[in-house]
Amino acid sequence: MLKQKKFFISTPIYYSSGNPHIGHAYTTIIADVLARYKRLFGYDVFFLTGMDEHGQKIQQKAFEENISPKALVDRNSIIFLNLWKRLNISFSKFIRTTQMDHEESVQKVFSYLYKQGKIYLGQWTGYYCVSCEENYNPAEIIKSQDNIMLCRMGHKLETKSEESYFYKMSDQAPFLKTYYQNHPNFIIPNERANEMVNNFLNNLEDLSISRTTFDWGIPIAENPKHVIYVWLDALMNYLTATGYLSNNEELFQKYWCDNETEIVHLLSKEIARFHCIYWPIFLNDLQIRFPSTILSHGWIITKEGKMSKSLGNVIDPNVLIDTYGVDALRYYLMADLSLFRDAIFSEDNLIETYNTQLANSYGNMISRTLGMLKKYRNNIVPKYVGCVLKNDEKLENLINKNIELVQENINKYSIDKALNCIQEILVEANKYIEDNKPWELAKNQQEQELDSLLVHLVKVIQVTTTLLSPILIEGSKKAVEQLNFDESFLTLASLASYDIFNYHKVNDSKPIFARIIVEKQ
């Protein structure tokens, strides 16, 4: 018996100082879609997401609201969880860094690395960004027109000097450069690896990993006036969520200790530095395998540029769900936005993509096919007898080829290209209808030809519904109900067979994706 393949995918844990926006939704939907596809492909999947709940910014925010930091992060974790529920996110675990088991494991990690000589006590002086939770040296800062020091994200910097524990990193750059070269798929896209080398590794410094100016964090057991700085705390969630250094390491052993597990960290490009440089150094010193791939996607921007609260162009995914529905949002983000570059979010494009690819193409194919089955065959799918029409074989070959291409593209994280392959099947099927003219086949009593056409169209619906099911969670369920399928019809194994529909009775058609009509101003 073949060993089941394993797939571990994580989002970054999201900082718990504010409400989720479209960027959070985008990252999490990508991870969910990849997790669902891998389950469809037969993988054992562990999908991790959660909240980063320590740090100065949270402590300040709680003070401003006159509540405790714990009350703030408790409230915000519920807000994120409610959004994930609305977006049909199928995570395996939702971790919070304020959980006791995480905090205890992080303290153990610090103590181990300190005893190994990887960590030392020193003095940190420089520029600090509260918003980014990041230190900046003079070479990295930007001066505004009025001479204010800004970080690369445009936030105001503070000048600080304090006692800090440091992680020895300055001598690890050659090791990482070699690893990048020998493992070209470690960082995707490849230009992100080049950014790491050119912008950071050539001047890699030891990393400050503790703070004394605030206390909302994990205290260091050896020196409790220090709390562990966000990145050593936050990055460890990928291990602690699986029970690393706890009383139950079963999941850690299952996923992290198996070198054949495909481990993917999905994240936005602004935090690539921490995952591509600091994280592998931590793992190397802990003698733990590296992730297979760090998948660093681009930003969602607007026509005005990057989203920011000050510009008032931050997009609330809840509003989009209320307006267009969850499937429309999930599909648009996966179909129109490539992971590997920045993409402009446009509601006009969302509507166009929805109407063209879901309402007109996929939804209309279901309506037309079920309508013909009702009209010509009393809702009964005819028996499959092979290729009868001259273009039956062409359609079958395209279906088989594109099923494989969808899998190949998903395994390369090219979700948009996979969806193009699915749409190609639907476009060809519409052409197949127009070429064969079922209304004339019925009129001329060409029963065998009409039967073949109907069977092949049901196969098109089964294949496209199966391949779209990781994205269209609600729409695929409605399609299954109308087709009177059970879950066994929506598996890769079932896609190879045409005779599973023999004399299968379908239900009447109801619109699944009604067109969005935009009133002209």
Swiss-Prot record:
This is Methionine--tRNA ligase. Zn(2+) binds at C129, C132, C151, H155. Keywords: Aminoacyl-tRNA synthetase, ATP-binding, Cytoplasm, Ligase, Metal-binding, Nucleotide-binding, Protein biosynthesis, Zinc. GO terms for cellular component: cytoplasm. Is required not only for elongation of protein synthesis but also for the initiation of all mRNA translation through initiator tRNA(fMet) aminoacylation. The keyword ATP-binding applies. InterPro entries: Anticodon_Met (IPR041872), Met-tRNA_synth (IPR014758), Met-tRNA_synth_2 (IPR023457), Methionyl/Leucyl_tRNA_Synth (IPR015413), MetRS_core (IPR033911), Rossmann-like_a/b/a_fold (IPR014729), tRNAsynth_Ia_anticodon-bd (IPR009080). Its EC number is 6.1.1.10. Pfam families: Anticodon_3 (PF19303), tRNA-synt_1g (PF09334). It catalyses: tRNA(Met) + L-methionine + ATP = L-methionyl-tRNA(Met) + AMP + diphosphate. PANTHER family: METHIONINE--TRNA LIGASE, MITOCHONDRIAL, METHIONYL-TRNA SYNTHETASE. ATP binds at K309. The keyword Nucleotide-binding applies. It is found in: Cytoplasm. Belongs to the class-I aminoacyl-tRNA synthetase family. MetG type 2A subfamily. Its cofactor is Zn(2+). Signal peptide: none annotated. The gene is metG. Monomer. It comes from Ureaplasma parvum serovar 3 (strain ATCC 700970). GO terms for biological process: methionyl-tRNA aminoacylation. A motif ('KMSKS' region) lies at residues 306-310. Binds 1 zinc ion per subunit. A motif ('HIGH' region) lies at residues 14-24. One of its GO terms (molecular function) is ATP binding.
